[in-house]
């Protein structure tokens, strides 16, 4: 954080990485082929979402299921959370089994293009939709930030299918193209699309895309994990700097550590006592 006075002579200089000891480094997304990233970004721009099938193996899905299922307990406090929907918050404080979802290279490669450097993890939850759950109220994830539309997205979300997503078991319902809307809200005439995908697949969508959890009219649960991300100058939904111990922060990947808030948005956003927060982990 300590920069030579002569290196900062314009306001533009303040928007650069001023850290000396903890310089910004590329994310794991840099390993993804550029053509693949460009195709993903074109789909995001057109539709507001992209589906990647079979990123996780059946064994990886079963491992996640085995770890998180014992923690499933109470259902939602209101109809938005879901009266028949179980949620596990602060997953990172409990297990490392979902880390590979948070920092998957395909995800980071898109976020590197969509958001500013040192973007943050906003939430990581396991969500289990039980039989009999009704459809969730349509919403867009960055609508909780009071900045009028139309605008560029302030956030993005991934939803990972740990169980198969079907049109009947609570698959997330998207409104393609709604990320470009202005102030208007969905109407019954708008086209909606359930994200039908096999277990191990992931849908990523921008924070301005209208969507909601689908109704589960089957006799089986539908388990998913969602990781959400936001611009580095916004307040995340989950206060990870409070819920994640420094011991855990030391043990996760560099990318996850950065997304937990052990990073700086230039020039000083996120500093601790005027210094880079990574010093707390030394």
What annotation goes with each model-predicted range?
Residues 120, 152-154, 219-221:
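A short, structural micro-pattern
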Residues 2-47, 53-148:
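Non-heme Fe(II)-dependent double-stranded beta-helix
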Residues 57, 100, 151, 195-196, ...:
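Aromatic-acidic/polar surface patches that form glycan- and anion
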Residues 93, 102-103, 175, 205, ...:
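A conserved hydrophobic position in a structured secondary element of the catalytic/binding core
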């Amino acid at each position: 954080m300590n920069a030579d006075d002569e290196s900062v002579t314009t306001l533009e200089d303040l928007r650069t990485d001023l850290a000396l000891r903890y310089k910004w480094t590329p994310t794991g997304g840099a390993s993804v082929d550029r053509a693949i990233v460009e195709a993903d970004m074109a789909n995001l721009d057109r539709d507001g979402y992209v589906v990647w099938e079979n990123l996780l193996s059946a064994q990886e899905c079963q491992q996640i299921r085995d770890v998180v299922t014992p923690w499933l307990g109470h259902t939602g406090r209101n109809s938005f959370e879901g009266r028949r929907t179980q949620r596990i918050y602060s997953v990172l404080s409990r297990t490392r089994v979902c880390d590979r979802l948070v920092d998957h290279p395909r995800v980071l490669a898109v976020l590197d293009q969509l958001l500013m450097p040192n973007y943050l993890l906003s939430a990581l939850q396991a969500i289990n939709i039980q039989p009999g759950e009704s459809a969730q109220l349509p919403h867009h994830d960055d609508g909780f930030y009071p900045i009028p539309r139309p605008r560029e997205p302030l956030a993005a979300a991934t939803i990972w299918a740990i169980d198969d997503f079907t049109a009947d078991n609570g698959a997330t319902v998207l409104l393609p193209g709604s990320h470009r809307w202005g102030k208007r809200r969905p109407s019954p005439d708008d086209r909606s699309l359930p994200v039908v995908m096999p277990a191990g697949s992931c849908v990523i969508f921008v924070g301005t895309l209208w969507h909601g959890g689908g109704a589960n009219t089957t006799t089986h649960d539908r388990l998913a994990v969602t990781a959400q991300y936001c611009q580095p100058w916004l307040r995340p939904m989950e206060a990870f700097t409070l819920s994640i111990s420094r011991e855990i922060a030391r043990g996760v990947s560099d990318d996850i550590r950065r997304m937990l808030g052990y990073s700086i948005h230039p020039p000083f956003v996120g500093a601790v006592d005027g210094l880079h927060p990574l010093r707390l982990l030394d």
